Amino acid sequence: MTSAAVTVSLEDLKNGNVSFQTLVDAFGPDSLGIIVVKDVPEEFVQLRHRLLSYSSYLGNLPQFRLDKIENPASKYLTGWSRGKETLKNGQIDTHKGSFYANCAFYVDPSLDCAKPTEEFSPANFPEYLSPNLWPSNIAGFKETFEDLCRLIIDTAVLVARACDQYASKEIPDYKPGYLEHVVKTSTTTKARLLHYFPADADAKEESNDDDWCATHLDHGCLTGLTSAMFINETKQVPAIPITYSYNPRYLPTLAELDSSPDPTAGLYIQSRSGETVQVKIPRDCIAFQTGEALERITKGKFKAVPHYVRGVRPGVAGGENDGAKIARNTLAVFTQPNLGEIVDLDQDISFGEFARGIVEKNTTK
């Protein structure tokens, strides 16, 4: 089934006009665990289109260039990866390509990764303390990536502020302003640009619903999401021109399909009642879903949301897209506490300790 997520305006967030009931409807025990923010700054639409176009350019680079931006030591939590995660059935996930970047630049433009602590160093926790690996010779990629992430994190700060107002009233001993502080000051926030490769026309359709991205919980606080962009990569091959007669600031944006050629492709959430719900995010909006750290910080008042993603099935596109290679691109920004921040007061667990266990569980051996 398809369901509309709770929607609020950016202006209401800025003015503190989001009611507690709205937050409970969005994030509470009986919710989908997702909120959509509308009326975001105008530049968001342009930045989204440009960065999600870059996702196809990146995914179609020659393998030798992609190899240069892989970082196995970080368990692929910086740079490019493909085929480094496992699906529910134990198979290696080659359906999607992933580019991770640290968003420490939001706090300090000179930072390329999280700040080390006494407990966590680049040697013992490279997953969060390895510097970014930006692809070379992709004009405007880094600039666009950082600009879009800043805008999304700015909005996440406002969502966090609204959550704090609720938590201060409803949770005993809650530290006022804690979640906003976490989102605004964190150097561990990460962004993930995703490229779901066009399905092989000869591939057999999987019977499992979550065959493209196994059902999981995000382990941060609030995950900012763009709507997905669908691209016909047969009609417009996303190859970077070898030479330009001038030095462009950005690569050309790619044409976005009006809608997904496969109505089953997209983001799915498992509701609290056990139903599987498809959630659609408008192109000019930013969605935020809850992660495990937020559930712990709010002592279960706000629940982490189990979710998965399906790409476009082979052979379902019709009309002018019949037989075409259809890619799905999107961006997720995981706002997370600093490594030393306590996310579970009862058990005295820091985010670094919590994240280390999650990363170990999710990475292929």
Kindly give the residue locations of the regions a language model identified.
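Peripheral, non-catalytic segments flanking oxidoreductase cores
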Residues: 1-365
